[in-house]
Amino acid sequence: LRRLLVSLHNPVALRKGGTDMRAVLAILQRLRAGQNICLFAEGHTCFDGVTGPIPRGTATLARSAGATLVTYVVGGGYFTAPRWGRGFRRGRTWGEVKGIYPPEQLKAMTDAEIAAQLARDLHIDAAQEQQVNPVPYRGRRPAEGLENALYLCPRCLSFDSLRGEDNRLHCTACGTQAVYTPYGALEGDFGQSQIRDWVAWQRQTLAGMMAEEGFALKDEGQTLRQVQEDHKVREVAHGTLHMDRRHIRIGDWALPMDSLRGVAIFRKNRLLLTDSNGERYDFASDHVRSALKYKDMFELIKE
C-alpha cells in the first residue's frame, strides 16, 4: 500500500524531529511549478484527538509560497484510525473547507496572524464532537495499543503498566480495569472516561513529578541508533535510557538537554531525537514502554 501511495502521489519526504529545509525547498519548487501541495500543518497525528500546536514555520511557508492557501479540516479520523491503535474502525469520517486565503491576503498578514488563523481553522476536538453528535466506531480489538497514548495509571501512578487488550484496558500494577466503548470512551474504575482528559492529566502530573529533586524517566533494554542520510541506522549504545532536566543518556552516550533540539515520535512509539548539529537518533525498545512520556518531558522542560 505504501509503494502504491508513493507512486500515485509522489509525496515530499519530511524528516521528523527537527526542521527539514530540503522538504521546504521541495514544497516551494513544486508550488512554483504549478503543482498543488497538501500539507498536514501539525506535522503528525495526535494521540488525544485534539489538534496540536501549528509550528510557526508553517505560517512562514504559507506567507512566502505565493500560492492560495485552502484550510481543510477532517473529522472522525481520530476514531477511525487512532494513532495509538491498530487497524481501522468502521464509522463516519468527514471533511470541510474552512477558509480560502489568496496570496495577497497572506502577504499582508504576519506569521503570528497566519499561525493564529490556522489554529482556529484546523482546531478539532474529537471527544467534544462525540458529545455533540455521537457516532459508533466499531472494529476488532479496539483497545489494543492504548498504552502508546496512556503511560501513567491514575490509580497507582505507575509508569508503563497499562495494557490494552481486545476492548479492555487494565493496569498490570494495581489491576484496575476499564472497557473502551465504540464511542471512544472508557467505562471503568480509572476515574478517567476520555482519552483526551487522561493525556492532559498525565502530562500535568508528570510536570509535578519533575519538580521533585532528582526525578528522572528511566527505561531498561533500550538501543540508541544514529539515523544516516540514507535512512540506514548505526547502533551507538545499549542499556538503560535516562532522562532528567539536564541530560538524556544511555550507556556511554549522553546529550545535554541544551543540545537537544527536537523530540518526535515515529508511527506509534518510536522515539526520535535531533541534536543541535542536526544529527538524528532513534530508540528501539525490547519491551513495552512509552515514547510519549519522553516527548512530554522534553516539551515541559522547554516551556
Predicted regions and their residues:
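General beta-strand recognition
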Residues: 94, 170, 249, 270-272
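Phosphoinositide-dependent membrane-docking surfaces
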Residues: 14, 241-270
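ATP/pyrophosphate-binding catalytic subdomain of soluble kinases
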Residues: 119-122, 126-142, 146-151
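Soluble catalytic domains of membrane acyltransferases
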Residues: 1-116, 132-133, 140, 155-156, ...
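Acidic, Ser/Thr- and proline-rich intrinsically disordered linker/docking segments
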Residues: 259-303
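Long, charge-rich boundary regions
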Residues: 177-255
